[in-house]
């Protein structure tokens, strides 16, 4: 069902700003009842987080449904108000079906080129988002910069007089 059930926590330091990064398993819809107890610690990690980095495999045919499942799960566990940074990974593996110019049938998500999909998501997302490829190392510096800015903002709000870090 999953590659791992355990949450991994690592200390990360960006430009002298330390923070803890937890990697949890992905959420699935209709989790079998007998597995819910196994995921309690993961759900606790999510509830206690200051920022959620939601990594989405954009090459998966149902990535939008997966996003909806995660949003609903966050609502269900009382973490729907957490700030989320939406990371669309695997842009190098994204494919679409090109429509002929004379095709009059309505376009669907499967007909959107990556640039059009980006515009669509950026326009409708109520959260910051980025499109990258971890494998091809595309847009990783922007991801790092964005994440640093978000963590710095949280840190500055929590420790307003501790500005020696940034």
Regions found by a protein language model. Give the residues of each.
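Conserved active-site aspartate in kinases
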Residues: 23
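Inter-motif core of Ras-like GTPase G domains
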Residues: 34-60, 72-79, 133
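C-terminal-of-GTPase-core extension/linker across diverse P-loop GTPases
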Residues: 3, 61, 65, 72-166
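Short alpha-helical interface patches
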Residues: 33-39, 100, 115
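Short loop/turn elements that form and flank the Walker-type P-loop nucleotide-binding site
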Residues: 14-17, 47-49, 79-82, 125-126
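Switch I (effector-binding) loop of TRAFAC-class P-loop GTPase G-domains
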Residues: 1-19, 28-38, 59, 63-64, ...
